[in-house]
Swiss-Prot record:
BRCT domain location: 591-668
Superkingdom of the organism of origin: Bacteria
Keywords in alphabetical order: DNA damage, DNA repair, DNA replication, Ligase, Magnesium, Manganese, Metal-binding, NAD, Zinc
EC numbers on record: 6.5.1.2
A GO CC term assigned to this protein in UniProt: cytosol
Protein name: DNA ligase
Record's catalysed reaction(s): NAD(+) + (deoxyribonucleotide)n-3'-hydroxyl + 5'-phospho-(deoxyribonucleotide)m = (deoxyribonucleotide)n+m + AMP + beta-nicotinamide D-nucleotide
Binding, NAD(+): 37-41, 86-87, 116, 139, 173, 288, 312
Record GO terms (molecular function): DNA ligase (NAD+) activity; metal ion binding
Length: 668
């Protein structure tokens, strides 16, 4: 590491922790990664490097000192008496040699390993009593996970009853196969929903569903690889896996016991070549000391077991030539460039296009038509240009010129302040109209069954609709003009359109596609102000007064409703008979005055008088907002026994600390 002062190390480490916390929250808790794995890994390893060089800068809440992400408050919490720790990562064979040397030094002799494929999914614990499945839970933060038993019962390869009346806990990986992932994303795209970035996030989003029927539809699978506290007769990893397979668990047939590191390297080479032909995603291999007694001897660090390591595959790259750069217009008018390239085989699929995101990104990469570029798949799924091979750039190459007019309607593009994107601000732009209608009809919005992208394209091409209000004037004769649209389809679509008139107003607000106003914000605003006429008259501060609604959302909403075009559209929808009122449950009665009303509270440690869920509900009934992490916005931290990093962070930030008993005394 280059020379660096203590102050410089503190500053860089603090910046890295902030970024890594945000990325980890997006990955673990929201199932929506914001950066590629290798970017996260590089930043994480840099933080480790700094903390190793300057131990005094390590903080209790550093991501290097904990496992996984925050716990979702919608699920019942599950304690893991034996923590579900994450694994250390290495990225080269030299680092694996160092791991092997470390193992031999610690145990005093050569070590045999059990190797497994590193499945790209999420960790899952299964508990059985007398042979019956009684609980399934996620890893969560390693010590407390989420109860997903109801959902796990819909995963076909999880045994509900074992052939023997055993009381055991096993652990493994829940994943989504490549075929199921492709099918799910195609369905979501057809319905106008955002697609999942990779199978891991699709699996996590599918398992962590409040509605088990959604999980059932998603075709999840498992590989089980750990028996927690196995019986004495089981003395090795490979023996435990064989026995779990006999009990009916789905284990990975590729795992094997290997005598030395040379055999491990052969295994890595074999599956580096085979990975794209597998029916499920892998991102490396896992190396475990096979002898369970040695595992006990080696133990764990605070964060990872000493006896296992994950070797991560490097991203696969291919070279290809950029033949064109095309621009497409989205629902909100954002114009996005895409590189069109000579097709290449990459990570198991043919790739011919890659997003260039925005003009700044395009200029930063320096991509030109005719350039040879290196291409990889972010998360093994999303094609992305890594770099331009400048040594192969044609002699007559010229810099690419960013367009100034919309590719759909020809009007001038604008660059709004504080945005990197180019926008078309013509509300009649055909491309925006098409995307807007697709969004309006999608499941999170008006949920008009049968009105997918292909039908919308035809309606616009045949000049039958120009905005969402026109949908409510469609007739049987209009729909009969569409290709392959018969009487049954016509009747079904007209019925679905008519039924959508009865939707609660928050679905209409969502369907309008207002920038920064998603389904959750729309519901909160509708719940508070009850009808669209009232909402359209609100000022920025009125909307921003709602907890969790920020100024950006409030400003965007008031700006939208101030436009004459928007007001005209709402009036047309009203005249067509659309409901303009909130039909959902009323807001809970206002809580009486108490010390926790309108306060942000964090619970930590083991509570004795209430379960975590019970105390959370009690505080929420008193008007408190209960969150999972401590920050400057936290008003109180209530702690029980064995309180950990949240307690320490509260002390650092000066957040008031209350014991469970002190908190109860203030509310009872």
């Amino acid at each position: 590491m280059a020379k660096i002062t203590l102050d410089e190390a503190k500053k860089e480490a603090a910046s890295l922790r902030t970024k890594l916390d945000e990325w980890a929250d997006a990955y673990y808790s929201k199932d929506a990664p914001e950066v590629e794995d290798n970017v996260y890994d590089q930043s994480y390893n840099r933080l480790l490097e700094l903390e190793k060089a300057f131990p005094e800068i390590v903080t209790p809440d550093s991501i290097t000192q904990r496992v996984g992400g925050e716990i979702d408050s919608d699920f019942t919490k599950v304690n893991h008496p034996i923590p579900m720790l994450s694994m250390g990562d290495v990225f080269s064979k030299d680092e694996l040699k160092e791991f092997d040397q470390r193992m031999q030094k610690l145990v005093g002799h050569p070590v045999e390993y059990n190797v497994e494929l590193k499945i790209d999914g999420l960790s899952l614990s299964l508990e059985y009593q007398d042979g019956k499945l009684v609980r399934a839970s996620t890893r969560g933060n390693g010590y407390i996970g989420e109860d997903v038993t109801a959902n796990a019962r819909y995963i076909a390869d999880i045994p509900q009853v074992l052939p023997e009346p055993l009381t055991i806990e096993v652990r493994g990986e829940c994943y989504m196969g490549k075929e199921a992932f492709a099918k799910l994303n195609q369905e979501r795209e057809d319905e106008g929903l955002s697609v999942f970035a990779n199978p891991r996030n699709a699996a996590a989003g599918s398992l962590r569903q409040l509605d088990p029927k959604v999980t059932k539809k998603r075709q999840l699978s498992t590989f089980i690889y750990t028996w927690v506290n196995p019986p004495r007769e089981i003395t090795s990893q490979h023996q435990a896996i064989e026995r779990m397979h006999e009990l009916g668990f789905h284990t990975n047939e590729t795992g094997r016991k290997l005598a030395n590191l040379d055999e491990v390297f052969d295994f890595i080479d074999e599956y580096t070549a085979k990975r794209n032909s597998l029916t499920y995603g892998i991102d490396g291999i896992v190396l475990k000391v096979d002898d369970l007694s040695l595992e006990q001897q080696l133990g764990n660090t605070v964060k990872v077991p000493r006896w296992e390591i994950a070797y991560k595959f490097p991203p696969e790259e291919q070279e290809t030539i950029v033949r064109d750069i095309v621009w497409t217009v989205g629902r909100t008018g954002v114009v996005t460039p895409t590189a069109v390239m000579d097709p290449v085989q990459l990570a198991g699929t043919t790739v011919a296009r890659a997003s260039l995101h925005n003009p700044d990104y395009l200029n930063e990469k320096g991509v030109r038509i005719g350039d040879t570029v290196k291409l990889h798949k972010a998360g093994d799924i999303i094609p992305e240009i890594s770099e331009v091979v400048l040594s192969k750039r044609p002699a007559d190459s010229v810099p690419y010129e960013i367009p100034t007019t919309c590719p759909s309607c020809g009007q001038k593009l604008v660059h709004l302040e504080d945005e990197v994107a180019l926008r078309c601000i013509n509300p009649s732009c055909p491309a925006q109209v098409e995307e807007g209608i697709i969004h309006f009809a999608s499941r999170p919005a008006m949920n008009i069954a049968g009105l997918g992208p292909k039908i919308v394209k035809q309606l616009i091409a045949k000049d039958l609709v120009h905005n969402v209000a026109d949908l409510y004037h469609l007739t049987e004769d209009d729909l009969a003009q569409l290709d392959h649209f018969k009487e049954k389809s016509i009747n079904n679509l007209l019925t679905a359109i008519d039924n959508s008139k009865k939707n609660s107003v928050e679905l209409l607000i969502t369907g309008l596609g207002i920038d920064h106003v998603g389904a959750k914000a729309a519901r909160l605003i509708a719940q508070k102000f009850k009808n669209l006429e009232k909402i359209m008259s609100l000022g920025v501060q009125d909307i921003a007064s709602i907890d969790t609604i920020g100024m950006t959302t409030a400003e965007s909403m008031t700006t939208y409703f101030a436009q004459p075009e928007a007001q005209k559209l709402i009036e047309e929808l009203r005249e067509s008979g659309l409901n303009m009122d909130y039909l959902g449950a009323d807001e809970p009665e206002e809580a009486p005055d108490n010390p926790f009303k309108d306060k942000t509270v964090v619970l930590t440690g083991k509570l004795e008088h209430y379960t975590r869920s019970e105390f959370t509900k009690k505080l929420q009934a008193l008007g408190a907002k209960v969150t999972g992490s401590v920050s400057h916005k936290t008003d109180y931290v209530i702690y029980g026994k064995d309180a950990g990093s949240k307690y320490n962070k509260a002390e650092q930030l000066g957040v008031p600390l209350l014991t469970e008993e002190e908190a109860i005394a203030q509310i009872e």
